[in-house]
């Protein structure tokens, strides 16, 4: 598992003549998929996918939506700045949104490792909970549940069509809360 910008990942794969790592977890795409879903803005995701597609052919990834780890909001701050997005405010929006502590949020995740001095935090939760299934079930809202399932399916469909190998994890196959 390597958590860094796509341009820095190629070295871990080696070369076709001297291969090293065969596959890496696709942490940055996971983070950018969740970011795009909450912000309803795909520009960061597109920039990150463009960077991945520019890597050599020997670079393969395991694509996933959730795993046993928290979501560290390690977005590409240079790209955010170029797009006119304040990196710190965006990160704070994302972790509050997925905590369910933002107006209009459907998510029911948990804040993890919050540091008031830096404003940094991470998010925890299953795919189903972050997509709104848990929140909709608690409210008995069938329309919200329908949207939550559609968000879950959207993310899984996107993941399945990314270059690399899709991985279901943490009860995704049964929408575990």
PLM regions: where:
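Active-site and adjacent substrate-binding regions of carbohydrate-active enzymes
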Residues: 1-177
